[in-house]
Amino acid sequence: MWNGKKKAVTFSYDDGVTQDRRLVEMMNTYGVKGTFNLNSGMQSYANVWEHPKGLLIHRMNTEGLKELYQGHEIAAHCLTHADLPKYDEETIRNEILEDKKNLEGRFGQPVVGMAYPFGTYNDTVVNIARACGIRYSRTIERTGNFGLPEEPLTLKPTCHHNDADVMDLIDRFLASDSEEPQLFYLWGHSYEFDVDQNWDRMEEILKKLSGHDEIFYGTNREVLFGE
């Protein structure tokens, strides 16, 4: 399935916030790869919001991001992080297509993936995403298992990094001897590690998941489509 391997690991992180710098460094250190879902219409350090726990969350400026995310995948997260089902079809199309075009121009790579802002979507949103050239899009509905998605445009992750059972799921994944392809798909927001003061949790996750010869480590696009 993946260069002859039956297991794969991938990561998906949203919003292009300053904490991505530390996360990317950690991922590179452990030899894993992921996909970063960006809002091109909001990609500025001046774009800041206050988390309910009091931390100020900043997106990064666009300068230097191509170098930062080198070796990882860039995917769309909509132009302005719009809650897509609340809008008309023209607005939905603009949110997706303009974000896709902007990101392709900035990063010099095709953008075929997306993560739905707020995790919200409906049939109209899915159909428009497909028409815009999006081949997969992540939701926030966890599966708690390792099967490949039947419909990539409503892709459900294995779990979030803060889920209580994440370590147990990793152990199950590593121990699995299934003949079927097994995918461990983790998602989140890197600012959550500052909010929850638990960067050590991600360190432990990466230590457990990395360095296994029988596992393919790839971006979302690589594990889904082999490209």
Pin down the residues of each PLM region.
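Boundary/entry segment of secreted carbohydrate-active catalytic domains
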Residues: 1-19
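C-terminal domain-boundary segment and adjacent tail
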Residues: 1-2, 29-31, 40, 104, ...
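Active-site metal-binding loops of divalent metal-dependent hydrolases
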Residues: 13-16, 78, 190, 220
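A short acidic, amphipathic alpha-helical/loop segment
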Residues: 22-26, 124-128, 201, 205
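Non-membrane alpha-helical structural segments and their capping/turn regions in soluble enzymes
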Residues: 89-94, 164-167, 196-199, 203
